[in-house]
């Protein structure tokens, strides 16, 4: 798995299951084979997406009729993608 996949799995668990981000992040990073740079990116994506969730939802709702009708997994992908585009300036292309 790459850093974005790891981050998305963590975000899904936190937002859908109510898991604690720090515990899930620690476990997933320890279980992964990511290098330090990718671990740092995954950490930033998780904490940043969760921290900016309300702002990201406002941005998404400008383009979607009813955000509550979206599947959770799709919504979290959009949140993470928009977080990267709006708040990170040195993220490598996928």
Features from the language model and the residues they span:
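Class I Rossmann-like S-adenosyl-L-methionine
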Residues: 1-94
């Amino acid at each position: 798995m790459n850093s974005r996949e790891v981050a998305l799995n963590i975000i899904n668990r936190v937002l859908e299951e109510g898991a604690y981000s720090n515990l899930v992040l620690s476990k997933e990073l320890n279980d992964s084979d990511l290098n330090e740079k990718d671990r740092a990116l995954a950490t930033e994506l998780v904490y940043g997406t969760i921290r900016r969730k309300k702002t990201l939802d406002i941005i998404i709702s400008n383009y979607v009729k009813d955000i509550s009708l979206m599947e959770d997994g799709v919504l979290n992908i959009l949140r993470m993608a928009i977080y990267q585009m709006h708040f990170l300036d040195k993220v490598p292309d996928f």
